[in-house]
Every structure is written in C-alpha cells, then in structure tokens.
C-alpha cells in the first residue's frame, strides 16, 4: 500500500501539468541555418512561393500501416529536391524543389504504431499487437500484404487503441489531463519522442530566405458512429514555439475546443493556424451552420473560427472541395476530381450540403447579413495529404499517396496480374470484398478507391520573403491560392481606382496594391461603385498552356427570395478568342490530347492571360465574394499514363483526361464597413 501511495505521489508531482499548454521555444535548442548565399531577399510587391502544408511520414499511424518508413527529415529533404526512396523501392524526386513544407503527422497516436510493430518493445508485447509485428520488414512489404494492411488499419487498429489500462493508468490520466494515459496501447514517451522528432526536423531544415520548414501536425477527429463524418485540421505554427504535446481529439474532439486551445497557446507565445481538409468527405460537418452542441452560429463563433482558421484546403489527393455538380449544376467544370464518399467510409455517401467551399462562401454572407458574423470568410490553399512523406504532383510521374500504392496495379489503374487475380479470387467472398477485388470489362482490378485519388495539390502564397514569419502573415491575411498540383502564377486584385490602368502598364502590380486590394481581402464599397478586377495568370513552364480565366461570383439575395446564388463568368480566353457577352463563355479553343501517347496540342492555349473585368450584373446593395479559377488545356490523367505505360486500355469508368487548374482566395465586396 505504501508503494502504491508513493507511486501515486510521484505521478501527481511529475505528471499533473497539461503538456498541451506547456509551450517551449525550440529555436533555443536547434541552430537556425543562415549562409551568405541564402541572404533573405524581400520583394515589396510580393513573390509567389509554392509548398505543401499536409504531409504524413512514418510517424503517422495510417501511413506506417500502409508501408511508410520515410522519416520527417527525409520528407523535408524530398521537398528540397533530393531523391528519396520509399520502402517499396520507389525512387521519389520532384521536378523542381518546393519553397516551403510542413510535416503534419497525425497527433493521434503519433509515433506509437511502430512500437506495436516492434515485438521487443513494451507495447509490442501487449495482447493484440501480434498482427502488427514487423509489418514493414522484409517479405511483409510485398504487394500481397495490401489487403492485410487494410484490415489492420480499418479494424485491428481501432480495437487495440481502445484497450484500457489498469487503475494506475487511469489515475495518471486524471492528473495529466491526457486520457490516452489510460489506454493500454499508448506510450507517452514514444509519442513525445515522435513529436520532438517532427519539431527537430522542421528546425534543422528551416533555411530563412531559401526554404521554409513549418512545425505542424494534424488534429484528427470525427462525429460519433454511425455517421462517423471526419472534420480534420492541420495545425501550422508560426515560428519555433510549440506545445510539448500536440492537442488531439482525446483532448477535445470538437473544432471549438481546438480553436479555444489555439487561443490559449497563442497567449503563451505559440501562434498557429488550423486548416481544415477534405470538407468534401465531411458529410456536411466542416461548414455546418451550428455549434457542435446544436446551437445556432453567432458572431462569437464566427470570430473564434476566423481568428484560428482563415484557410481551407480546396483540393488534395482525396478530391476537390470547390463545389459539387449537385450544388452547381450550371457550372460545366464542377465535376473535377469529385470523391463522393465519407473520409474512411468508402461505401457511405457524403452529403454535399455543408461540404464544399463555394456554398460555404454564400452561407457566410447570409449569416453576416443576419448579424451573426461570417465564419466562412476563408482563403484557399491546395495540399497533397500524402502518406508517402513525398507528394506526387505530376500526372506523368504519379507514384501514389502511400508506399503500397507505388505500383499501378495497387493503385487500380491497370489490371491485376493473372497470379494475383487468381489468388484474390480464391479467397472467401468477404475477404475478396475487403481486399477490393473488382471485376470490370472482363478484367480484374484492385478496387476502385485508388483510381479516385488525384495527383493534387499545392499551396501558393504571395509573400515579401520566404521566411516563416512572412509566409505565415500572408496565410493569415489569405493572400494565397490553391492549385491541382501545377505551378500556375496567379494574381487577383479589386479596386475602384483602376480606371486609368491598363493590363500592359509598367509597375502594374505596385499600382494594383496601391489602388485596391489583393486576393483574400475585403473591398469596402462606401460609394456604391462597381469595382474593377485585375486577373493575371502565367502558365506552369512544365504544364499545359492556359485555356481560360474565370471569375466565380457568390452572393446572398436577402430580398424576399432569401437564397444563396452563384454565377461563373469567363473573363479571358486564349488563342485570340472572345467571351460571348450573353453566355459569358469562351468558345472552345480546340485543344486536344492524343491518347496513344498523351501528347497535347502545341498550337493552342496561352502562356499568359491578363485582363481587367467589371461585374455586368453588379448591384451595390448586395454583398458578394469573387474568386478566380484558371483552367489549363486538357492533359492525360495519371491513371491514363499508367495504362499507357503498361500497354493496356484504361479503365472505362475513370476519366481519361483532366484540366489542371488554380483557385484564388476570394475578394469580398461589401456595401458598408460591417465586414
């Protein structure tokens, strides 16, 4: 009894502090790299920097179970342009380096599953860990293990994670405020070690002026069963200050709890932004119109959210969240990389309402007009959500989003080999279903899910310099845009003093800043004027030529109609074509793709499109938001490239081509200063 009380006292004294509220400045431990050749260059007109703020490495439980053994440090090396080889022997390298990067492993069970895989560790000796033992060693890494890993990920992981510890663990959890201390399959030391590894990698790879490495992680949560709708966020820290332990769903599973925690640690010196992703798969949860407890949204909610969550991922590997054909039936380009199922629930439909950013923009304007604030005044970024430590943005060099999807066969884009199809067909029907065996067009494929993934996306930030501080402030003010993986350069401005400007003016950008506002900002229309918009896009030198520029207008009609509305305007066409004044559409420029070799039209499209535009339907009494969408000429989708290399016909149900694109953050035009 005395020993028990002594142990209890030690636990109380050593573990009573909430580590999520203990902030440390890690710059004091790790030397910041500076060298003469990396002198920081500042551009008052701002330069565009491309990067990825959503990357999973071997420390994420799901990435590890899918074969990822690549460390956070190696992930940053990849972002800098170095060659990295994954556990399946796939050689991964970017065509050109990125400017910034954040490893964002799941805070949930970060660094713990590889302990389950080690039979010599304390956790590896627990009952139920045997199927995980040596899972990423030797012969266990072959393609045939894919179906086994799916079961481990979707079933065994949850059962093991739910096992409770004894009384001592429960007492420790009470005093530490970390309920995971009461979980048998959790080890706080392993968890903190992985978190520290992520911080150390970011600090050591951060090179101000040359390459920015952000400290970050993913807050992973969802609604209770049976809905189980996910609303995950990545948390990106401004500098070197971060908590001793990441705040996870076990600390609070609702986003209001996350935002409140962000407020608390900001007061302690650790500023951060949360960026939600896969709203398309959230079953209406990311942009719901109420608190998590059912109360209606009010201005306090809107302020809390916008203070902590000014951005959203508009595209990534698991689909695009701009809009859905059901929400935008008049938008011919709405059906782009749509993934209709819930995150992690491949057979359950995700309700488009409350799941897409265009509708959210309109709902935010409606809430604002009702005096409840605008919780959806959001800017856009793209990201990869790679679980391979290394994102694959290039359609012609796509190597999957996880280590085990490194082969075309495992991605489902080419038929299974005869031997593998025979093996899977010999399994019981339920095992065949779990393994994803699918017979289509007289051929056998490994499921449908892999082909629904996209080679997407990237975040673009307009910033004075390539440093944490400058990039973070740009993200805070929403001067950002997202792309589907290409590096289109895109400017978007609005102002009332652009009448004397022309698209060919010298110092056009400086004048646009001086006389108006950039993407992500508010334009207050005190004099009821019709603003002019400046849109300027340049093609990715490694991508296809540009086909058209579009402005999407979103507004709320607060008259007797009380309805949200949207309209797509083409504002600039390639190849000397003109926008039809009635349909507001460019004629087809005739660009095509040769599906025998994926070559594209060389004489169609533009290297650059630049124009001024005014809304022909402008009504000064209605608040509206406007954002730009840039479309490239069509190119082969990655799945078509896979089939072409394998010498087989592409799958009939998978799109053969895509139009890569970019989306600017919106500009909000308000009739008064209440914005």
Language-model region placement:
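Acidic, metal/ion-coordinating pockets
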Residues: 257
């Amino acid at each position: 009894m005395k020993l028990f009380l002594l142990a209890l006292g030690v636990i109380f004294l050593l573990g009573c502090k909430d580590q999520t509220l203990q902030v440390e400045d890690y710059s004091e431990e790790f030397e910041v790299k500076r060298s003469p050749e990396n002198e920081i260059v500042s551009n008052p007109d701002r330069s565009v920097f491309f990067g990825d703020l959503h990357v999973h490495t071997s420390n994420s439980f799901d990435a590890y179970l899918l074969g990822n053994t690549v460390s956070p440090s190696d992930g940053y090396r990849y972002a800098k342009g170095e060659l990295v080889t994954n556990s399946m022997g796939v050689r991964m390298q970017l065509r050109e380096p990125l400017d910034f990067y954040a490893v964002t492993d799941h805070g949930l069970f970060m660094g713990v599953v590889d302990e389950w895989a080690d039979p010599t560790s304390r956790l590896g000796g627990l009952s139920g860990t045997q199927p995980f033992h040596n899972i990423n060693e030797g012969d266990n890494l072959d393609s045939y293990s894919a179906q086994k890993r799916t079961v481990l990920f979707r079933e065994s992981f949850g059962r093991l994670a739910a096992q409770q510890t004894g009384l001592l663990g429960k007492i420790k959890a009470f005093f530490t405020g970390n309920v995971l201390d009461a979980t048998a399959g959790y080890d706080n030391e392993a968890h903190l070690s992985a978190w520290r590894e992520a911080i150390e990698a970011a600090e050591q790879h951060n090179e101000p002026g040359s390459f920015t490495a952000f400290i970050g992680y993913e807050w992973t949560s969802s609604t209770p069963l049976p809905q189980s709708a996910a609303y995950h966020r990545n948390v990106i820290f401004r500098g070197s200050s971060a908590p001793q332990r990441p705040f996870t769903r076990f600390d609070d599973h609702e986003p209001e709890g996350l935002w409140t925690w962000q407020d608390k640690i900001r007061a302690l010196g650790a500023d951060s932004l949360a960026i939600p992703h896969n709203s398309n798969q959230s079953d209406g949860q990311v942009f719901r119109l109420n608190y998590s407890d059912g109360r209606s949204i009010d201005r306090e909610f809107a302020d809390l959210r916008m203070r902590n969550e000014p951005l959203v991922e508009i595209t990534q590997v698991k689909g695009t969240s701009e809009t859905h054909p059901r929400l935008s039936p008049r938008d011919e380009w709405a059906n782009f990389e749509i993934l209709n199922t819930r995150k992690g629930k491949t057979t359950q439909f995700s309700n488009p309402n409350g799941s897409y950013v265009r509708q959210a923009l309109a709902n935010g304007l409606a809430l604002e007009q009702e005096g409840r604030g605008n919780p959806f005044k959001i800017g856009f970024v793209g990201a990869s959500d790679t679980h391979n430590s290394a994102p694959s943005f290039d359609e012609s060099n796509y190597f999957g989003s996880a280590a085990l999807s490194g082969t075309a066969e495992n991605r489902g884009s080419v038929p299974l080999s005869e031997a593998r199809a025979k093996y899977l067909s010999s399994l019981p029907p339920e095992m065949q279903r779990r393994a994803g065996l699918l017979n289509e067009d007289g051929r056998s494929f490994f499921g449908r899910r892999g082909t629904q993934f996209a080679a997407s996306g990237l975040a673009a930030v307009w910033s004075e310099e390539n440093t944490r501080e400058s990039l973070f402030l740009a993200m805070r003010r929403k001067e950002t845009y997202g792309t589907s993986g290409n590096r289109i350069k895109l400017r978007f401005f609005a102002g009332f003093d652009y009448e004397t400007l022309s698209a060919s003016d010298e110092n056009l950008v400086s004048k646009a800043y001086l006389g108006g506002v950039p993407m992500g900002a508010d334009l207050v229309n005190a004099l009821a004027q019709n603003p002019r918009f400046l849109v300027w896009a340049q093609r990715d030198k490694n991508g296809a030529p540009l086909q058209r520029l579009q402005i999407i207008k979103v507004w709320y009609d607060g008259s007797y109609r009380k309805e949200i509305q949207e309209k797509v305007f083409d504002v600039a066409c390639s190849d000397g074509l003109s926008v039809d004044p009635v349909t507001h559409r460019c004629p087809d420029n005739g660009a095509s793709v040769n599906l025998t070799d994926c070559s594209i039209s060389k004489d169609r499209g533009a290297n650059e499109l630049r124009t001024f535009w005014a809304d022909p339907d402008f009504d000064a009494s209605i608040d509206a938001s406007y954002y730009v969408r840039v479309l490239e000429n069509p190119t082969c989708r990655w799945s078509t490239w896979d089939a072409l290399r394998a010498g087989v016909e592409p799958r009939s149900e998978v799109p053969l081509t895509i139009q890569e694109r970019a989306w600017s953050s919106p500009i909000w035009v308000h009739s008064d200063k209440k914005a």
